[in-house]
Amino acid sequence: NSIMSGKKLDDIPGITYNKKGKWIQTGPSERITHLGEIQSPYLIGLFDDLKQEEYSVNAIIETDRGCPYKCTFCDWGGTTFSKIKKFDLDRVFGEIEWAGKNKIEMLNSSNANFGIFKERDSLIVDKIIETKHKYGYPKLFETSWAKNSNQDVLDLAIRLEKNGLLRKFGISVQSTEPEVLKNIKRSNMKINDFDDILDRAKQNNISVMVETIVGLPGETF
């Protein structure tokens, strides 16, 4: 809209563009205050034509936006100003229902910390399971699980696994060295809690993916 209205690229916040071989980054864009202002592309019919085609389709939804953490080597918290905002549950449920009706193979939630809202995210998992039983879809659900995942978060993964929906359960540690974690402004769960999570996941046949970053400040010289 800005370009069509004749606005110069320099005056459009929140973009990066190439100007005569030099990359230009404009200032930060104003954050959307009310997520209800954003229409769902699924619910307004932008992707309805997909159901006419014999494609294997994945879909991405977002149930909340933002991250309360400010880990140095993660762009999520810094770019979203840390405050988490939630999409209306009716919208989220509508998108999950759309995914089921339209035979979406894998539903991906692009949240930064799925499971951080215990009761709300439990309701969302209920809806995903209910939708699969109703339509046979989605086949799988994937997301970025809450940092410092606890047993409550693992409970969500176990329910998904029991209904054949879980692809993997991811735990991000970045590093286990205390000095490195201090350098990158990050804290992890206690190692005993981490072991308990792994043991219980194994007991429930859940594949666990552990995310680390190699060569963080203070780790290698």
Describe each region flagged by the PLM.
Residues W23-T26, I38, L181-I184:
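Short clusters of hydrophobic/aromatic residues that line enzyme substrate/ligand-binding pockets
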Residues Y42-N204, V214-L216:
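Radical SAM [4Fe-4S] cluster-binding motif and immediate context
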Residues N1-H34:
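Glycine-rich beta-alpha loop elements in corrinoid/cobalamin-binding modules
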Residues S29-D48:
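A short, charged helix-loop
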Residues E219:
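Catalytic palm subdomain of template-directed nucleic-acid polymerases
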